[in-house]
Amino acid sequence: MMILALLFAAGFVAIAEQLKPSGTVFEQPGAEVDALLHVPAADYRKEWVLLGSFSVLADQAEKGAKQLHVVYAEPKTVDAYRNTGVFPDGAVLVKDVFAGKTEQMTTGTVSYAGPLAGRFVMVKDRAGRYDGRSPLWGDGWGWAFYEGTETRKTVTTDYRKDCLACHEPARSHDLVYVQGYPVLNR
C-alpha cells in the first residue's frame, strides 16, 4: 500500500510539473543562459586588467567627449589572448560608459569621466552553445547593457538590433575594438 501511495504521489508531481503556468523564469526561452550575463560581483576596477579606453566626441568636437568608455577583463583573459590571439571561452569583458565632463584647464580643453551612464558586458561563447537560445547571444558572444548602477537587469532585448551595428566594423577582430587595448598586444 505504501508503494502504491508513493507511485501516486510521484505521478501527481509529474502532472503538476507539466501544468505549471507558462512565463515562469525557467520556462522563458533563454532565461537560463541569460542568467550568465550580468555585471561581475568582483571589484573589476581593482582586480581586473584595464584593457584601454575610448573617448567618444560630442557632436561639436570643441565640446570635448560626450562619453568615455573604459574596458576591463580578467587577468586570465588577457594572458590567454596574448598567447593565442583569441578570446577564450567564458571570457568576460566589461565596458564602463561614463558621461564625459569637459572643461578648460591649464593644459587646455580636457575631458574626463563624469557619472556612470551604464555598463556593457560581453561573455565569450566560442562553441556557440547559446546561439539561438536567446536573442542576447550570437556571433560568439553574449551581449548586454545595464543602465546606471544596475548589475542584473539588462535593457538589451536583441543583440542584433541593440549591439551589432556598433560592433560590425570590428568583425575581423571578433567584434571587439582591440586596437584600443594595447595590453592585448603580443
Model-identified regions with their sequence ranges:
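Secreted/periplasmic proteins
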Residues: V49-V71
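Bacterial N-terminal signal peptides
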Residues: M2-G11
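N-terminal post-signal-peptidase region of extra-cytosolic proteins
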Residues: Q67-N83, Q104-T107
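Sequence context surrounding c-type heme c attachment/ligation sites in exported
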Residues: L19, G23-T24, D34, A41-E47, ...
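Sec/Tat signal peptide C-region and signal peptidase I cleavage site
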Residues: F12-I15, K20
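Catalytic cores of secreted/periplasmic or lumenal enzymes
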Residues: V25-P29
